[in-house]
Design a protein with these regions (language model features):
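Residues in short coils/turns that link rungs of repeat/solenoid architectures in beta-rich domains
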Residues: 111-112, 158, 163, 191-192, ...
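Right-handed parallel beta-helix
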Residues: 150-254
C-alpha cells in the first residue's frame, strides 16, 4: 500500500521499505532507490530471441520449421517480444504460427526485392516456403495467430516455383490472419507467392512497405469492420523475366488480381502500385458484403482492368490521384469498369490520369451507381480506332466536371438508360465531343467548343489536316498520326485508314459541298468498291490504280448540321507486301487532308484543327 506523509517542508511516499522524499520548501527533490522501485512496480521486460539459438540454420537445406516455432512460442510464453531472423536462407518445410504480441523480425527495414543483376542471389533474411504445393486450400504458410502479431523485415520465396508452369501451381496464402485485431505485415517481399496476403475478420490491420509479384492474388480483405490500412505496397514482376507475350506473364495479366477488397469498412489505401495483372484493384461482394473506403495515390500499369467495381457500399469508393494504364499490347483494356452487378454506392475520381493502350477509360454499366470524374486527365483511349468514347455511360448517374481530354475522337457517350448526366467545364482538343442518347436527361454546360460549331462562315469552307493536332473531333476509326513519307508532303502528317474510316463533319443545311481528299492509295488497296460514302450513296470514287494526290467528290445538300461520311478502302498488311516490315496492321490509304467547300463560299478557308482563318 502506498501512503503519503506531509510536513512543513517535505512529503514522503512510502511503499513497504521504499521511500521517496520530496523537498518542497527548498525546491529540491531527492529520489532514492529509483531502479529498485521501477523493478518492483513496472512490467517485466519483453523477450527477445534469435532463431539460431533454437537451432535454426540459414543454409537453405535444413528444415527450420521446429526451431522457428519453438522460438515464437517461447517469446509468447514470456508475454510477447521479438524473434529475430538473421541473414540467411531458412528452409521451412511446414507452417508457422506467430502468436499474439510477437514479432517475427528479419534484417530488412525497407521492402526488399530480388537482385535483378544476379537473380539467384537473395541477401538478407529469406524464408524458403515448401508447404501446400498444388492446392489453394489448407493452412497458410504463416498465420498471424493472435492480435498484434507482426511479420516484418523478411523475404519469402517458393523454390519450387517455375515460370514455365502455366497455369501456375497453386498454394495456400503465404500469410493469413483471421479473427484478430491490430496485426501487421511490414517491410516484406513476397517474391513468387500464389496468393500473398489474406485478411479475414481482422480489424485495424496494417500492411506497409510490401513488395512482390504474387501470381493469383496479392491482397484479399474481407469481413474487416474497423479501418484496415494498406500503405506503400508495390506488386511488380520481381523475380520474373517479364515479357507481355510470355505465357506465364500473360496468364497473370489476364487472371491475376493485385488487390481485392470485399467487405471492409473505412478502408484506407495509400501509395500503392501494381503492374501486369488482369485486375489491379477489384471491389467484390462476399457473404459479408462489399467495400467503402479512401484510395489515395494508387496506380495500375499494364492491367486489363485497372479498377473493377463489382459492388460497393453506399458511402462509396473515393479514388484520388490515381494513375491508370491499359495492358501492354491489348485492345480491350478498360481502366475503370463499374459492373452491372454493382447494387449501390458512388465511385468518385478526383485528379486522376489515364493513358496507354486503352479501349475505354471509364465504363459505367450499373443502373444503381453514381459516378463522378473531377479534375481528371484522359490522355489516350480507343486503341482500336473504332470510335469508342473515353467515358461510356450506359446507365446510372454521372457528373463529369473540369476534366481534360487528349488523343481520341469521342469523349463521352451518354446511353439512353442513363438517368442523369451533368457534363460541365470540360476541355478537349478540337472541342468537347458528346454522343448524347439520353435527350434532356443530359446537361452540357460551359464545355470547350469548336469554331465550326459556332461560325457559319467557317463552316462554309474549311480544311482538316489529318494527323495534325486536334483532328480527332472529325476523324474516327483510323490509325494514330504519323509522319508523311511522300515527296512534297514530307512535312505533313497522315493517318492510315481502316476499312471504314469515318469523317464527322459540320455542314450548312441545304448547301451542296465540293469535297477534296488528299491521299496516297497504294496498289494493294485498290478496289472497285473504294470510295467516300454518305450512307449507301457514294459521293466520291477513288482511282482504279495506285494514286498520290487529290480526289474530288460532291456532297448533296443535307437537312442536318452534321454528316458522317464513310471512307471505304480495301485493307492490306505491310508485312505481306514487305517481308522485312514489322507492321502487322491491316491498313487502307494514307490520308493527308480533307477540304469542304459549300457552293457559293468565298476563297477564305478556315483551318478546322486550329479554328484560324487562312
Amino acid at each position: 500500500m502506498l501512503t503519503w506523509k506531509a510536513g512543513k517542508s517535505a512529503r514522503t511516499a512510502q511503499n513497504g521499505k521504499l521511500q521517496f522524499r520530496f523537498l518542497g520548501s527548498s525546491g529540491m527533490r531527492t529520489l532514492h532507490w529509483i531502479a529498485l522501485f521501477l523493478l518492483a512496480v513496472g512490467p517485466a521486460a519483453a523477450a527477445d530471441l534469435d532463431v539460431t539459438s533454437m537451432g535454426a540454420v540459414g543454409d537453405g537445406k535444413t528444415d527450420c520449421t521446429a526451431a522457428f516455432q519453438k522460438a515464437l512460442d517461447a517469446v509468447a510464453a514470456k508475454g510477447g517480444g521479438i524473434v529475430n531472423v538473421p541473414a540467411g536462407h531458412f528452409r521451412i518445410d511446414g507452417r508457422l504460427k506467430i502468436p499474439g504480441a510477437v514479432t517475427l523480425q528479419g534484417t530488412f527495414r525497407t521492402p526488399p526485392t530480388d537482385q535483378r543483376e544476379d537473380r539467384p542471389k537473395l541477401d538478407g533474411s529469406v524464408l524458403l516456403a515448401f508447404a501446400g504445393r498444388g492446392s489453394r486450400d489448407g493452412e497458410p504458410f504463416i498465420r498471424l495467430a493472435g492480435s498484434t502479431a507482426t511479420l516484418a523485415g523478411l523475404m519469402i520465396a517458393y523454390p519450387e516455383w517455375k515460370q514455365t508452369d502455366v497455369p501456375p501451381v497453386p498454394y495456400p496464402p503465404t500469410v493469413l490472419t483471421q479473427d484478430t485485431v491490430n496485426t501487421a505485415i511490414l517491410d516484406c517481399c513476397f517474391l513468387n507467392s500464389y496468393e500473398a496476403i489474406r485478411y479475414q475478420s481482422a480489424a485495424r490491420f496494417l500492411v506497409r512497405n510490401v513488395h512482390g509479384y504474387p501470381t493469383f492474388r496479392g491482397l484479399y480483405v474481407d469481413a474487416c469492420y474497423d479501418i484496415g490500412r494498406v500503405e506503400n505496397v508495390h506488386f511488380w514482376p520481381f523475380g520474373v523475366t517479364y515479357k507481355p507475350d510470355d505465357p506465364f506473364c500473360k496468364w497473370v495479366n489476364v487472371n491475376g488480381v493485385a488487390f481485392e477488397f470485399a467487405r471492409t469498412d473505412w478502408q484506407y489505401v495509400v501509395n500503392t502500385f501494381c503492374f501486369g495483372y488482369g485486375v489491379g484493384y477489384k471491389f467484390s461482394r462476399s457473404q459479408a458484403g462489399s467495400c467503402n473506403g479512401n484510395f489515395l495515390g494508387i496506380g495500375a500499369d499494364s492491367c486489363r482492368r485497372a479498377v473493377l467495381v463489382e459492388d460497393s457500399q453506399y458511402p462509396g469508393l473515393l479514388i484520388t490521384n490515381g494513375e491508370f494504364v491499359g495492358r501492354w499490347g491489348s485492345d480491350d483494356s478498360v481502366c475503370l469498369e463499374v459492373a452491372e452487378s454493382a447494387s449501390e454506392g458512388k465511385v468518385s475520381l478526383n485528379n486522376c490520369s489515364f493513358w496507354g493502350p486503352i479501349d475505354r477509360c471509364v465504363w459505367l454499366r450499373s443502373p444503381a451507381v453514381q459516378f463522378t470524374a473531377i479534375g481528371t486527365h484522359f490522355r489516350e483511349w480507343d486503341v482500336n480506332r473504332r470510335g469508342i468514347p473515353a467515358i461510356q455511360l450506359d446507365a446510372g448517374k454521372a457528373i463529369v466536371q473540369g476534366n481534360t481530354f487528349g488523343r481520341g475522337d469521342l469523349h463521352v457517350l451518354v446511353g439512353p438508360k442513363v438517368r442523369s448526366a451533368i457534363l460541365m467545364a470540360n476541355q478537349a482538343a478540337g472541342g468537347f465531343n458528346v454522343d448524347n442518347q439520353a435527350a434532356g436527361r443530359t446537361q452540357l454546360v460551359a464545355n470547350e467548343q469548336n469554331i465550326l460549331d459556332t461560325s457559319e462562315t467557317a463552316k462554309s469552307h474549311y480544311r482538316l489536316d489529318i494527323g495534325a493536332p486536334d483532328d480527332n473531333r472529325y476523324v474516327r476509326k483510323c490509325f494514330a498520326p504519323e509522319s508523311c513519307q511522300y515527296g512534297e508532303r514530307s512535312d505533313k502528317t497522315i493517318r492510315w485508314s481502316t476499312s471504314q474510316t469515318e469523317f464527322h463533319l459540320p455542314v450548312l443545311r441545304g448547301k451542296p459541298y465540293t469535297v477534296n481528299l488528299d491521299l496516297n492509295l497504294p496498289q494493294a488497296a485498290v478496289d472497285p468498291a473504294n470510295g467516300l460514302y454518305l450512307g449507301d450513296q457514294r459521293v466520291m470514287e477513288l482511282p482504279a490504280k495506285a494514286y498520290l494526290g487529290t480526289v474530288t467528290g460532291r456532297l448533296p445538300a443535307c437537312d442536318k448540321d452534321h454528316v458522317i461520311l464513310t471512307l471505304k478502302v480495301k485493307t492490306w498488311c505491310p508485312k505481306d507486301a514487305d517481308p522485312n516490315s514489322k507492321d502487322m496492321r491491316r491498313i487502307g490509304a494514307a490520308l493527308c487532308s480533307l477540304t469542304m467547300k459549300a457552293d457559293g463560299a468565298g476563297d477564305g478557308v478556315t483551318n478546322a484543327n486550329t479554328g484560324d482563318a487562312e
